[in-house]
């Protein structure tokens, strides 16, 4: 049971943060975001909850694996910091509708996730590889945020 908790609790935390972020996004997603100029590479709206669900599971599994393997607390703290920065992006971009601060935040998030992957890879390759889909999605999101900032 304890081993199961190593994985379940981080996954639930990711979904809780994601649901909290969606609370602050809802009005902007339905009223403001559709009016913005977006690039042709913008995924359909239905892709976002699917992608984030997969990403949250992978993020939680990554931390769970680190905890189970007894990795140092620095990596867990880094995981937590990137989750907070991820949440802040939703506030900055959607709730405050500040495209510039959203872009700064997501660039910071890109860096934090890259650092996490590179540091975790040295200790636990599987845990690092679980973050790769998240990093790739973030790169797309960074492109989208940058485009929206430049053309709106």
Question: What is each PLM-predicted segment?
Answer:
Residues 38-50:
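Short aromatic-rich membrane-water interface segments that cap or initiate transmembrane helices
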Residues 93-99, 115-128:
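Membrane-helix boundary connector in multi-pass membrane proteins
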Residues 35-38, 99-108, 130:
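Non-cytosolic membrane-interface motifs at loop->transmembrane helix junctions
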Residues 125-152:
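Terminal transmembrane helical module of multi-pass membrane proteins
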Residues 91-101, 148-152:
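Membrane-interface helix caps and helix-loop-helix hairpins in membrane proteins
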Residues 27-40, 150-152:
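Membrane-interface helix termini and inter-helical loops of multi-pass transporters
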Residues 2-24:
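N-terminal signal-anchor transmembrane alpha helix
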Residues 52-63, 82-85, 109:
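Core segments of transmembrane alpha-helices
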